[in-house]
Curated annotation (Swiss-Prot):
HAMAP family: RimP. It is found in: Cytoplasm. Belongs to the RimP family. GO terms for biological process: ribosomal small subunit assembly; translation. The keyword Phosphoprotein does not apply. The gene is rimP. One of its GO terms (cellular component) is cytosol. Required for maturation of 30S ribosomal subunits. Gene3D superfamilies: RimP-like superfamily, N-terminal. Keywords: Cytoplasm, Ribosome biogenesis. This is Ribosome maturation factor RimP.
Length: 187
């Protein structure tokens, strides 16, 4: 889910080590637009989440730093034919969930899932994330008594639902990042 197409996956192989080398993780990469349209390479990234709960957020300086590092590699390797625009951003508060670990990290928060096949007569689900069991995502669906287990491989799109609780977590994450940035600046 971090990349949709074969071209996205090749770009991830090229750019993941670059992002990691400068201290970030790529959450999602999409090369969008066709031959006639201006193509756009969209990279969503974040700082790795640390044991103490800090990280996971990116500010404008982080986006610029990653953009410069990625641009150097893209210019040298030239993996994209034609012109394109590079966009680097944070995933935002109501972020996409693209890695199995995301479903564990955001346990207790509401999410929407879309599957590549029917499960119990539908492809779309909304509920509260209940963690991960092996390679399956656990989700508590409204009106259901038992926790549903969905194979991660079946999920084509997943996103957190914007709630007051999620907004509060986002504010706490930003505050922790700002405090960490201030401590590093004063050292």
């Amino acid at each position: 889910m971090r990349g949709k197409t074969a071209e996205d996956l090749k770009l991830l192989d090229l750019l993941d080590p670059v992002a990691e080398a400068v201290g970030y993780e790529i959450v999602r990469l999409r090369l969008m637009g066709g031959e006639r349209n201006q193509r756009r390479l969209q990279i969503m990234a974040e700082r790795p989440l640390l044991e103490d709960g800090t990280g996971g957020d990116m500010n404008v300086e982080d986006c610029a730093k990653l953009s410069r590092a990625v641009s150097e590699v893209l210019d040298a390797a030239d993996p994209i034919s034609g012109e394109y625009t590079l966009e680097v951003s944070s995933p935002g508060v109501d972020r996409p969930l693209t890695r199995l670990k995301d479903f564990d990290t955001y346990e207790g928060y509401e999410a929407r899932l879309e599957l590549d096949r029917l499960a119990e007569g539908r492809k779309r689900f909304r509920g509260v994330l209940a963690g991960v069991e092996g390679d399956q995502v656990a989700i508590d669906l409204e009106g259901e008594e038992e926790t549903a287990l969905v194979p991660f491989a079946w999920i084509v799109e997943a996103k957190l639902v914007l709630t007051d609780e999620l907004m509060k977590r986002g504010a706490q994450t930003r505050a922790a990042r700002l405090e960490s940035d201030e401590q590093q600046t004063s050292e």
